[in-house]
Each structure stands twice: as C-alpha cells, then as structure tokens.
Amino acid sequence: MSNAAQDTVKNVLFLCTGNSARSIMAEAIIQREGMGRFRGFSAGSDPKGAPHPQTIALLRHLNHDVTHLRSKSWDEFAGQDAPQMDYVFTVCDNAGAETCPIWPGQPISAHWGIPDPAAEDGSQARIGLAFHDAYRMLRNRISIFVNLPLAQLDRLSLQRKLDDIGMTKDHEDPETA
C-alpha cells in the first residue's frame, strides 16, 4: 500500500435501525479515538428523527462534541454525492439482518452487535447503566479497530479481524483472547 493510501483519512459508517443511540455513540467515539485517521458517520434504516436524549447526555458528560450529531437515513450514504465509505459496521442485530443499500466503493463491512440501551425500560439507574455499557462496548471495539495495522493487512485478513472484533466479549481483546 502506498504512503498516500496510508495517509488518507478513512470514512467509517455505523448503522443501526433507529440511529438514535448505538450508531450515534460510535460516530462520536471514532471521531475522537480515530485521532484524525478516521471520519465517523452514522445512519439508520428507520431513523428516529433525533438522537436519544440519554445518548446526547452521556456523550456530553464524556466530553464528546455532539454539535453535528443527528439521526439520519442510510439513504444519505448510498447516493453518488455521498462520501465514499471505507468501512461499514452494523451495531444492532436488526440492521445486521436487513438488506443494506449497495455502498459505493465496496467498503469492508462487519457486524458488531451491541444490546440496544434505548430498549431498557427499568429504573433511571438501569437505563443509565445500559447506555454506559453500550458506550463501553463500542469504545472497546473501536479502540481495537483504530489500532489495527491496516496498511499491513490484505482485505481478507482485515475482514477476519473485523469479524473477530464483532464477536469479542466487551472485556476481551481479540489479539489476546
């Protein structure tokens, strides 16, 4: 891989059905964890119209920039004028099972299923814990991803590593598991 290709900022799209919690969190996490090497996006097959208030509150509490976060349809990323994605990750089982649009540029994709914190209907403490758990799982997986030696991996090896990340328990690193 050329140095120019290694230096290019990689576009990463995170998908879930409602685009209100997990995919929004992942977009914010990779913006920060990616250290300028990755640009995060998120979308949903049936977007809720706005990020979940608990998502925004948690991200603000953790000092993420939430200024540009919004709930949007994955159709925004399937058109000719959309930014070309290098990676597409589904973060919910519903989106993982849906027929996704054909993404321009043939990005590498993987499923990283995370339980939906917005589905928690217990006490405020349980809801808060569900959002924190989802954030932690996403941050762990994204941290592993952004630290992969991408320039040294062929497409098939990279696909295997991305699939392995999706199957990791939230406390494991696939490199040591």
Describe the residue ranges of each PLM region.
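Short glycine-rich anion-binding loops that position phosphate/pyrophosphate groups of nucleotides
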Residues: S20, D93-G96
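Alpha-helix C-terminal capping/helix-to-coil transition sites in glycosyltransferase folds
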Residues: P83-Q84
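Residues at the C-termini of beta-strands that transition into short coil/loop
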Residues: G44, C92, G113-P115
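Conserved active-site segments centered on acidic
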Residues: S2-G79
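Phosphate-binding/catalytic loops
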Residues: T99-A177
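Residue-level detector of flexible, active-site-proximal loop/helix-junction positions
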Residues: P47, A95, D116-A118
